[in-house]
């Protein structure tokens, strides 16, 4: 069978993209290297859509939870993954958890039943130079293909190590303690050109005693261990975990990410120092999305366990009540700097016949990966049908996630991201915080319905 679309990778994104195309009668070749003599260090078998790290798709609450809303939106788009999850579901309270083997088998059976879909167990080593292609090879892309992608995109555009710093919701930061400023007021001209006011960082101050206590918490905090196949991956200077830096010496953090120089704290203003004084140490947060709702803890990539991160980082002045959109981590990964390399339709700008989907685009999580695969499939289907493609509204989970990875995120600090309400266009400021999540989901559902009517 001569294919119209080549999909590389049979994980969550690749299988969902293949389903969306095949059910529209489009001829698809789905290449998966597992089962063809190759595997990855993380997979146990060769099943399509094999779940590696967890059997949970997280919350299924579509009224108060962003990932639950994403479940809802995918179901409305006839998602194969959501249908398979329903058949493989196991008790897990309000979460959607599945039997991994049943889930994978359901996905594969549904795809094999499609007459226009061919599943080929083969490793693809080179990025295709022509023909419609979707690359959905995930975080453990084969080295040969990763090298080919790196050649096509530039050596600095393909990361092989996640340096994930925590991200905090802006409205949970105590600005009665923290303040806005840039070090030495540098970069004001560039900031103003980008629509800022020259004060681009949120700064959380520490006294000497607070700093020393915080350092001890970092050193004592319970940490996760590298998986066996990650253990030999070297640290890079820009990926050094915060607790590893802390262990190098008492002052290391103060001369690194917690450097206080050039940052006058106006809350500490006196008659002698009307602009305030420098703290002993400072934790800086940098805006992480264009909406200004999410702020990245600069230099705070970490291997602390998630519960420890919440506990330890809430000892930082100004972050006592911090709510985290994403917690930090450090692990081997392969992902593109998508805001730089991809257009709004997930096409590689330098080779528009190639689209990327799933975790390699910088989305994080099973559901997010599948949703981006679904969108890639819908985009290609529209292209083949000769139809204009309109992306889902940014008020929806699908639209917010797509916008984030294709341009809304800051390219210089781009890291993998789960779906969360901080990515959405804000609801009206008059909506009370208690009902804000319901406002997001109700608006999304209404806007999604209108968008679905436009699909091919």
Curated annotation (Swiss-Prot):
One of its GO terms (molecular function) is tRNA (uracil(54)-C5)-methyltransferase activity, 5,10-methylenetetrahydrofolate-dependent. The keyword Flavoprotein applies. One of its GO terms (cellular component) is cytosol. It comes from Novosphingobium aromaticivorans (strain ATCC 700278 / DSM 12444 / CCUG 56034 / CIP 105152 / NBRC 16084 / F199). It is an enzyme of class 2 (transferase). Pfam families: GIDA. This is Methylenetetrahydrofolate--tRNA-(uracil-5-)-methyltransferase TrmFO. Catalyzes the folate-dependent formation of 5-methyl-uridine at position 54 (M-5-U54) in all tRNAs. One of its GO terms (biological process) is tRNA methylation. Its main location: cytoplasm. Belongs to the MnmG family. TrmFO subfamily. Its cofactor is FAD. InterPro entries: FAD/NAD-bd_sf (IPR036188), MnmG-rel (IPR002218), MnmG-rel_CS (IPR020595), MnmG_N (IPR040131), TrmFO (IPR004417). The keyword Flavoprotein applies. Keywords: Cytoplasm, FAD, Flavoprotein, Methyltransferase, NAD, NADP, Transferase, tRNA processing. It is found in: Cytoplasm.
């Amino acid at each position: 069978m001569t294919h119209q679309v080549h999909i590389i990778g049979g994980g969550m994104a690749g299988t969902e993209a293949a389903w969306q195309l095949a059910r529209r009668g489009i001829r698809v070749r789905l290449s998966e290297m597992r089962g063809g003599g190759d595997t990855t260090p993380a997979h146990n078998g060769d099943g399509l859509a094999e779940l590696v790290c967890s059997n949970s798709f997280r919350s299924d609450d579509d009224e108060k939870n962003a990932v639950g809303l994403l479940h809802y939106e995918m179901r409305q788009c006839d998602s194969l993954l959501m249908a398979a999850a329903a058949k493989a579901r196991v008790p897990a309270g309000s979460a959607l958890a599945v039997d991994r083997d049943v889930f994978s088998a359901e996905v594969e059976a549904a795809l094999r039943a499609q007459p226009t879909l061919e599943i080929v167990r083969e490793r693809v080593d080179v990025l295709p130079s022509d023909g419609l292609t979707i690359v959905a090879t995930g975080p453990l892309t084969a080295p040969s293909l990763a090298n080919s992608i790196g050649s096509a995109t530039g050596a600095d555009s393909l990361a092989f190590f996640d340096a994930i710093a925590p991200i905090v919701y802006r409205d949970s930061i105590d600005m009665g303690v923290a303040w806005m400023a840039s070090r030495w007021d540098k970069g004001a001209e560039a900031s103003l050109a980008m629509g800022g006011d020259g004060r681009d960082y949120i700064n959380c101050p520490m006294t000497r005693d607070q700093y020393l206590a915080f350092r001890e918490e970092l050193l004592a905090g319970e940490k996760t261990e590298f998986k066996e196949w990650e253990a030999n991956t070297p640290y890079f200077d820009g990926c050094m975990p915060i607790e590893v830096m802390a262990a190098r010496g008492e002052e290391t953090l103060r001369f690194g990410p917690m450097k206080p120089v050039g940052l006058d704290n106006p809350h500490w203003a006196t008659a002698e120092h009307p602009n305030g004084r420098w703290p002993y140490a400072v934790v800086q947060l940098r805006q992480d999305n264009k909406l200004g709702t999410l702020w990245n803890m600069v230099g705070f990539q970490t291997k602390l366990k998630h519960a420890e991160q919440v506990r330890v980082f809430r000892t930082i002045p100004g972050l006592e009540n911090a709510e985290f959109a994403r917690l930090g981590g450090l692990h081997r990964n392969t992902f593109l700097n998508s805001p730089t390399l991809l257009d709004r339709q997930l096409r590689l700008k330098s080779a528009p016949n190639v689209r990327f989907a799933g975790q390699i685009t910088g989305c994080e999580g099973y559901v997010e990966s599948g949703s981006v695969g679904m969108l890639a499939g819908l985009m290609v289907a529209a292209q083949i049908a000769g139809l204009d493609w309109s992306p889902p509204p940014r008020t929806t989970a699908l639209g917010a996630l797509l916008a984030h990875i294709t341009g809304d995120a800051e390219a210089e600090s781009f890291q993998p991201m789960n779906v969360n309400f901080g990515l959405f266009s804000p609801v009206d400021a008059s909506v009370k915080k208690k009902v804000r999540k319901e406002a997001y989901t109700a608006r999304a559902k209404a806007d999604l319905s209108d968008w679905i009517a436009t699909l091919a």
